[in-house]
Regions:
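Aromatic- and charge-enriched surface segment that lines or borders ligand/interaction sites
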Residues: 77-125
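N-terminal lobe/hinge region of extracytoplasmic solute-binding protein
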Residues: 32-83, 114, 187
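A bilobed periplasmic-binding-protein/Venus flytrap-type ligand-binding module shared by bacterial periplasmic
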Residues: 93, 206-209, 262-272
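Surface-exposed binding/hinge segments that line
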Residues: 80, 91, 126-179
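Gly/Pro-rich hinge or "lid" segments in bacterial periplasmic/extracellular proteins
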Residues: 159-220, 228-231
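Ligand-site clamp/hinge motif
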Residues: 209-254
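Short, well-ordered beta-strand elements
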Residues: 27-35, 87-90, 109-112, 156-158, ...
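Ligand-binding "clamshell"
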Residues: 252-266
Length: 272
């Protein structure tokens, strides 16, 4: 599967607005995102829509949601449910490496989940004293997943809170190296890796030559950081950036333009 030149940039953004000409031959693209000046790039703790969308280029989950809203294996190679539907066994792909060269193992999946649970602060009854805004982006995972265990380096068994195929939707969170789950800018497994970050200014990404899938068509991505959506759209209007992420109500102002076009896509929350 070759990632398209637009979907490869922002796999889950609410809306893309792009210039109509000149992108196909480009080796780099610039995108406007809205984020705080003091943003920490910790993918399990983010709550900035634009940044989460951007970092879907850097990180991958066990499963991803396809265009038909169905979960499909990503870092997972295979999966199977127990007869009673209360457990699901997931086998990892054996050709996955993080950007730091480390091979993906089940220990990384377990450590990622352990840290997510720590952030959420849930007890056995899913009670938590942690404010919702501070529980991390993926705390709802634990409404479906009760416990997890690595049975070997390539296999994880998940115990579910209820028998449901829908539990696979909960396994789309990004997998991080066990040693970097709480780190800033941890290594990922995706088609792009970090090339730099200046708070309040920009995030730079470069193509991951060691990616397990076919290489992306765009080599470099610069994400310029703006305080507001209006500032981001103004940057697009003045051609300071190639892409602006925004909601459809804002994109409608470009509907009659011959120099731009819009692409609508789902976020992790299935917004449009």
């Amino acid at each position: 599967m070759r990632i398209s030149r637009f979907a490869a940039l922002l796999l889950a953004c609410a809306l893309l607005v792009l210039p109509a000409a000149g992108l196909a031959a480009s080796t780099s693209l610039s995108v406007a995102i809205v984020a705080d000046d003091h943003l920490a790039l910790r993918p399990l703790e983010l709550n900035h829509r634009d940044v989460v969308s951007l970092l879907n280029l850097v990180y991958e989950g066990l499963f991803e949601i396809d265009d038909n809203y169905q979960p499909q294996p990503k870092l997972a190679y295979a999966y199977s449910f127990s007869n009673d539907g209360r457990k699901v066994q997931v086998t990892l792909r054996d050709d996955i490496s993080f950007h730091n060269g480390q091979t993906l193992t089940s220990a990384d999946v377990v450590a990622t989940l352990d840290y997510m649970l720590e952030l959420a602060g849930f007890n056995e009854n899913l009670d938590s004293e942690v404010p919702v805004a501070d529980r991390g982006l993926y705390y709802s995972t634990f409404y479906s997943i009760k416990s997890w265990e690595a049975t070997d380096e390539q296999t994880i068994v998940f115990t579910l809170r209820r028998a449901s195929y829908g539990s696979l939707y909960a396994l789309t969170f990004p997998i991080l190296p066990a040693s970097q789950v709480a780190a800033d800018m941890p290594a990922g497994t995706g088609p792009y890796k970090y090339d730099g970050y200046e708070q309040g200014s920009a995030i730079w990404l470069t193509a991951n030559d060691g990616w397990w899938n076919l290489p992306p068509q765009v080599r470099y991505v610069r994400a310029s950081i703006y305080d507001t959506a209006e500032q981001a759209l103004n940057a697009f209007d003045t051609q300071s950036v190639d892409i602006a992420m925004t909601r459809s109500i804002n994109a409608s102002r470009y509907s009659g333009s011959l120099n731009t076009f819009s692409i609508t896509a789902r976020t992790r929350q299935l917004e449009v």
